[in-house]
């Protein structure tokens, strides 16, 4: 089982960090930026934006990349309105200990994972001019990065993780099941 598992793991995108046959432990890791919600569930968000003729409802899985619009809290160009398109770019890292040992019934296998979910954000600035009913991207600003620090959310298999934000995440079990499915006992 051990040799087959190591061989099968080497064919996946998971990185084998450490192999210790004597202690019966394998340590593997991964980092992804696409389809994160396949691996962790951080809920769903619904952002509504309404400004003159522009009506948008953005519903998205919090774990995944997304974009939505929101108005600036302070308006300095009245009657014009400044608003932003916000781009969330999350990533997920997982690191797992895989324990493989003989037992009376065959082979005992367990997978325990530590996940870390984080996102960075960027935004574009727009100007709405009601006199012309015009929405214009302010390209002179360029896409800006949000500089405030977003606390990573870390959690283990079968635990919920949350930070200072309102986001709570939990494993879907996909990673652990993919590892277990590699093993033919």
What are these regions (language model features)?
Residues 1-185:
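Ser/Thr-rich, low-complexity intrinsically disordered terminal regions
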């Amino acid at each position: 089982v051990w040799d087959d598992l190591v061989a099968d793991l080497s064919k996946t995108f998971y990185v084998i960090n450490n192999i210790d046959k004597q202690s019966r432990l394998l340590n593997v890791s991964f980092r992804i930026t696409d389809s994160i919600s396949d691996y962790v569930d951080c809920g769903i968000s619904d952002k509504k934006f309404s400004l003159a003729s522009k009506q948008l409802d953005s519903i998205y899985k919090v774990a995944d990349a997304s974009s939505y619009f929101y108005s600036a809290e302070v308006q300095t160009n009245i009657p014009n309105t400044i608003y932003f398109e916000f781009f969330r770019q999350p990533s997920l890292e997982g690191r797992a200990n895989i324990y493989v040992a003989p037992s009376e019934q065959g082979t005992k296998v367990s997978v325990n994972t530590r996940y870390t979910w984080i996102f960075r954000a960027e935004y574009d600035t727009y100007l709405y001019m009601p006199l012309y009913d015009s929405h214009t991207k302010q390209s002179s600003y360029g896409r800006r990065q949000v500089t405030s620090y977003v606390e990573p959310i870390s959690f283990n298999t079968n635990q919920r993780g949350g930070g200072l934000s309102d986001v709570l995440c939990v494993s879907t079990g996909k990673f652990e099941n993919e590892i277990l499915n590699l093993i033919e006992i």
